[in-house]
Design a protein with these regions (language model features):
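Nuclease catalytic cores that cleave nucleic-acid phosphodiester bonds
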Residues: 3-5, 11-172
Length: 172
């Protein structure tokens, strides 16, 4: 079973105070930071992540699909909102009964629509909480699973050689 996470990009950016501040200066930088956070989350959670950004106000925009370190990044075409794209993708993925779909958005209407399609939802704020919790858990697990072992040279050489080296160390 594949577990998809569809992310309403700008909605999730603006749910994070530090990213919203970055977005005020540079949407490109905010999008990159979001995608980087989602890439790390994908590696730890095993979701297949699709993040969707509105480009519906871009005159003549044809839309695009990019791969950013293992996540699919969608820029919608002119006159297509991220919400519309996410709804259509949710319905398409929901036809495969074996797949699980979660949509990250804080848009109430969007949540109702995707719930009706058979997907689950997570608010943008809750997604940030899950990302941070997953990261902290992985760090703690990694730290605890690899005890630091000292491997002093004394354990690798015979006592006679150790004594010779010790004498050399203190010789003047």
């Amino acid at each position: 079973m594949t577990h998809y996470l569809l992310v309403d990009g700008y909605n999730v950016i603006h749910a994070n105070a530090s990213l919203a501040k970055v977005a005020a200066d540079s949407l490109d930088a905010a999008r990159k930071k979001l995608c980087d956070a989602l890439c790390e989350f994908r590696a730890l959670s095993r979701y297949r992540i699709i993040v969707v950004f509105d480009a519906h106000l871009v005159a003549g925009g044809i839309g695009s699909v990019e791969n950013h370190r293992g996540i699919k990044v969608i820029f919608t075409k002119e006159a297509e909102t991220a919400d519309h794209y996410i709804e259509a993708a949710t319905y398409k993925l929901a036809r495969k009964k074996q797949d699980k779909i979660t949509v990250a958005t804080s848009d109430t209407l969007e949540q109702l629509i995707i719930l009706a399609a058979g997907a689950s939802r997570i608010s943008a704020a809750d997604l940030w909480t899950e990302i941070e919790t997953t990261r902290k858990t992985a760090l703690a697990t990694h730290k605890n699973s690899r005890p630091i072992k000292k491997n002093p040279i004394e354990s690798l050489i015979d006592p006679e050689t150790a004594q010779i080296l010790e004498n050399m160390r203190y010789a003047k």
